[in-house]
Amino acid sequence: MTRVKRGVVARRRHKKILKQAKGYYGARSRVFRVAKQAVIKAGQYAYRDRRQRKRQFRALWITRINAASRANGLSYSRFIAGLKKSGIEIDRKVLADLAVHEKAAFAAIVDKAKAAQ
């Protein structure tokens, strides 16, 4: 039986990691051992931040809604409570978009929330 050398397999594995590390600074894109660690860490950051992105956007929407509703004379918590009582089911993403781009429409929604209280 012939001897199997692992040169081809190792080179393919190294090339794969170095390709993933393309664009990294210094040894992180050139040295296999360092590049492998950098790619693993990048994957961990990506996994974590895909979840954090959802939280951060929700926080941003709430901040925008709060600012716009206070400009119309109502705090965020009272505004959301008023929406629930009046049966308006618009999610925070859409409310934040209205607050930024359609100020008149948002003001009308705030008036409905005020009336419900």
Swiss-Prot record:
GO molecular function, one term: structural constituent of ribosome
GO biological process per UniProt: ribosomal large subunit assembly; translation
Top-level taxon of the source organism: Bacteria
The entry's keywords: Ribonucleoprotein, Ribosomal protein, RNA-binding, rRNA-binding
Gene3D superfamilies linked: 6.10.160.10, Ribosomal protein L20
PROSITE patterns: RIBOSOMAL_L20 (PS00937)
GO CC aspect terms: ribonucleoprotein complex; ribosome
InterPro entries reported for this sequence: Ribosomal_bL20, RIBOSOMAL_L20_CS, Ribosomal_protein_bL20_C
NCBIfam families from the UniProt entry: rplT_bact
Role summary: Binds directly to 23S ribosomal RNA and is necessary for the in vitro assembly process of the 50S ribosomal subunit. It is not involved in the protein synthesizing functions of that subunit.
HAMAP family noted in UniProt: Ribosomal_bL20
Family under the similarity heading: Belongs to the bacterial ribosomal protein bL20 family.
Protein name: Large ribosomal subunit protein bL20
Organism in which the protein naturally occurs: Chromohalobacter salexigens (strain ATCC BAA-138 / DSM 3043 / CIP 106854 / NCIMB 13768 / 1H11)
Organismal lineage: Bacteria, Pseudomonadati, Pseudomonadota, Gammaproteobacteria, Oceanospirillales
